[in-house]
Amino acid sequence: MAIRWSELCIVLFALSYAICVLAGKSYYDVLQVPKGASDEQIKRAYRKLALKYHPDKNQGNEEATRKFAEINNAYEVLSDEEKREIYNKYGEEGLKQFSANGGRGGGGGGMNMQDIFSSFFGGGSMEEEEKVVKGDDVIVELEATLEDLYMGGSMKVWREKNVIKPAPGKRKCNCRNEVYHRQIGPGMFQQMTEQVCDKCPNVKYEREGYFVTVDIEKGMKDGEEVSFYEDGEPILDGDPGDLKFRIRTAPHARFRRDGNDLHMNVNITLVEALVGFEKSFKHLDDHEVDISSKGITKPKEVKKFKGEGMPLHYSTKKGNLFVTFEVLFPSSLTDDQKKKIKEVFA
């Protein structure tokens, strides 16, 4: 059953303003668009993200609800020309002052969240976006630390791309076609079509560089992508492609990841293997995990620690931790030691 908007909006509006401020992310980062994004870019980015994180598609998922609140809050500001200008110049504090002085405010104080979504999807129905001609997507392999994938984090990545700039003169484009006839022989004519336009200005490509903040969400797996809509390669008379960061887990000194599970090796002495031991270690977020044993531990024995693996993406659940115990045997024994061991096990 779909979540009721009247109940949902109370929760989302209560969260929406504080979320972006506390997280330290800009509204452009939230919508995954560059600061110079056009109104159409912002609308399309909002549409895609709202479809992805809509509560009806993620029921019971608190993380998706939080993201949906962020997205709506950011869109309310960036879709309003006056609010966006104030935000660009003065940031969050400027929006607060604007609201305090009788302006429409930002962060949940103007539009109704249901109105925002309904303007795109007709009262909440989630239709797929129509296809448009786009430039090439740019895919970047991004190594994320296991710590960031366990707790969530962000990375700043330097990005250079082609940007379309004005240039002198005019250019041929797809605005309109002109049909004319050419004589190719006695009584024979060929109909020709030519793309012409005397209104479109010429353009050129220039390279520009800037930093992109990539959010690493808890539980993301290898191959998952963080997309920045229309921040890929530009194309004349069309929309730019997308910039996509494809996640790869960086090697870790202690853990090996297998989906939602973690694996690690722990060395113990022969005495510890026989009589038991007390051991613990600090996990990726520094909480202590007790792996002690009171019984006999066999070489290569594997013990499972439930809920000590990786968090599942968009879930409060976690995978498991599997610890393989390596028993360190002594390289040699004295005759006296051998005698005592025989006496013990006789």
Swiss-Prot record:
High-level lineage: Eukaryota, Viridiplantae, Streptophyta, Embryophyta, Tracheophyta
Localisation: Endoplasmic reticulum lumen
PANTHER family, A to Z: DNAJ-LIKE-2, ISOFORM A-RELATED
GO annotation terms (biological process): pattern recognition receptor signaling pathway; protein folding
Native species: Arabidopsis thaliana
Protein name per Swiss-Prot or TrEMBL: DnaJ protein ERDJ3B
Assembly notes: Interacts with SDF2 and MED37A/BIP1.
Signal sequence bounds: 1-23
Gene assigned in the entry: ERDJ3B
Domain of life: Eukaryota
Residues bearing glycans: N267
